[in-house]
């Protein structure tokens, strides 16, 4: 779906693809919102070969992730965590972190970067 609807306001916004890294597909959920305090994204992680190294990233601030579909291997500061549908995590995004889709299936998650 390319549209986001605010039920209370009736406004419709087009999701905007954003390239934060080539490792994952990001869609901004607040593109065009002036003065926002957070950056919400719908993120898709496609499965990769088992032997492919995980891409690690770090950026200022904090990050909240909630898995919407699939199973995700999340590495934060050399610690591995497995998140399943409905699981969420809030962490210091200045620490090196990366994600990998598990079970040969793509993963979708909500990411909010503060």
PLM regions: where:
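Solvent-exposed residues in well-ordered beta-strands and their adjoining turns
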Residues: 44-48, 77, 112-114
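Short, conserved beta-strand element in jelly-roll/cupin
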Residues: 58-74
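Single conserved hydrophobic/aromatic residue that forms the stacking wall/gate
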Residues: 2-13
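Conserved short histidine dyad/triad with adjacent acidic residue
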Residues: 14-16, 22-32, 41-59, 93-94
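Short acidic-glycine-tyrosine-enriched beta hairpin
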Residues: 29, 77-92
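Ligand-binding loop in jelly-roll beta-barrel domains
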Residues: 24, 36, 84-85, 93-114
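Histidine-centered active-site/metal-ligand motif
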Residues: 2, 59, 97
């Amino acid at each position: 779906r390319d549209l986001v609807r605010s039920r209370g306001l009736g406004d419709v916004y087009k999701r905007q693809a954003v390239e934060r890294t080539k490792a994952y597909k990001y869609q901004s959920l607040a593109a065009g919102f002036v003065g926002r305090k957070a950056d919400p994204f719908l993120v898709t992680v496609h499965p990769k070969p088992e032997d492919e190294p995980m891409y690690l990233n770090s950026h200022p601030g904090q990050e909240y992730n909630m898995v919407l579909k699939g199973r995700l291997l999340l590495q934060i500061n050399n610690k591995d965590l497995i998140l399943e549908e409905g699981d969420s995590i809030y962490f210091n995004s200045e620490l090196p972190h990366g994600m990998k889709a598990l079970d040969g299936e793509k993963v979708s998650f909500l990411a909010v970067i503060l």
